[in-house]
Amino acid sequence: GDPTDLIPKIAKLVGANDVFANEDYESYAIKRDKAVSKQVKLHLYKDTVIMRYDEVANGKGLPYRVFTAYKNTWLAKLESDYRFIGEYKINKKKIKEQESTKKIEISSLKDIGFIESEAKINKIELSVIDEYAEKRDFPALDNTSKASVYLRFGFVSVRSLIRKIMPIDNEGKKIWLSELVWRDFYFSILANFPHAEKNCYRPEFDLIEWSDDK
């Protein structure tokens, strides 16, 4: 269904005055969240990135267009403030328990058509970092961390991964961390230069006429 219709309806159904979610920086998600926020109080929080698109800027306060410069500033900010990857503990004393008198029927995954897959999800393998610098680019070798899909769908926190690798001191760690920085850079580009999602990063190149139409 359409989340702009379903989210407000579900909030009303369960008696929720506010909806809390994590930020998404793709153009579709931004439009979706704006539409939802017009119907229900929507609170969005940074989660999928370490540093938001507006937290890393050049000396003039403008977003970076080149990755290396972005990465250098990103690493310097992390070095000076480890709160970017800090852990947050929930104060359970402030959370009130309230038993709902309204019974809500929620369909199971089986009821809505999902079937159990025989595919096994691989664990995230941080042990590969020791040889990551030398072996990461060889498809025949099983030497990737397998973290990509977990990060993409929010199954694991990018902060927890960085906290785990910070004590490591080798070239593999530097490259793997650089690839996580690239994720933030990618989202920064999406947020600051939304035209790049479907057009050339530099708009003037959209006018190039390709002889083979590709």
Q: Predicted regions span which residues?
A:
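Glycine/tryptophan-enriched, flexible segments
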Residues: 68-208
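Acidic/His metal-coordination segments adjacent to aromatic residues that form catalytic metal sites
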Residues: 209-214
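Trp/Phe/Arg-rich N-terminal binding region typifying the photolyase-homology
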Residues: 1-82, 172
